[in-house]
Amino acid sequence: MRYIFHISLLFLFSTLYSSRCIENIEVNLWGQCYSINETFKLNVSGSGLTGSIPLEIGQLTNLYSIDLSNNRLSGEIPAEIGNLHKLDFLYLQDNELSGEIPVEIGNLKDLDRLFLSSNQLSGSIPKSIKNLQDLKYLYLFKNNLSGTIPSEIGELINLFKLDLSSNFFSGEIPLTIGNLVNLNSLRLFNNNLDGDIPLAIYNLNKIEFLFLHNNDFENINKIDLEKIPSLINVKITD
């Protein structure tokens, strides 16, 4: 019994010590200490994390990659994420995150990949998204996002893959979608989009995958897919 007691005390003291970070030099995230200046990559994917994303994550300003995917994180994406100006990759998919996408996401001007899919995010896409001029992958599918698709999305001219499927977006596809001339894949299916599919999609001469089904478009039969010869896989009707 005494041996077990000593082991328990050792475990308690080691746990307390490991979670005691050096003030102004380290931050505590999920019981681990991370150097403020020397943490460049944070990968805790599939670690069974719960609760909210700590606000302190915004202090790790040298991060270029965050992967918190495949956990059970809840609550809102903290606005402090916008402090991470060097971030190239942000993977938050497959969690239970809710609330709106923070406008501060537009501060991440070096971002290459933004994966927020398979969460419970609501509200609209912030117009500050237009600041992400280097963005190549934008995955927002399987959320509760609503409102119209902002015309500002057409300013992301380096986008390679855009997936907004399985949300509650309404209104028309913005004409500016035709500006995305580097787009390889466009997935907008399972939404409440209506009106006409803009003929500007004919400008997407590199697109190979186009999925627009399960919406309420009015001019589906007038779309001439032969004008987009790059297409490999397409579905625009239910």
Functional labels for PLM-detected ranges:
Residues 21, 194-238:
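Leucine-rich solenoid repeat scaffolds
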Residues 2-56, 227, 232-238:
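N-terminal capping/linker segments that flank leucine-rich repeat
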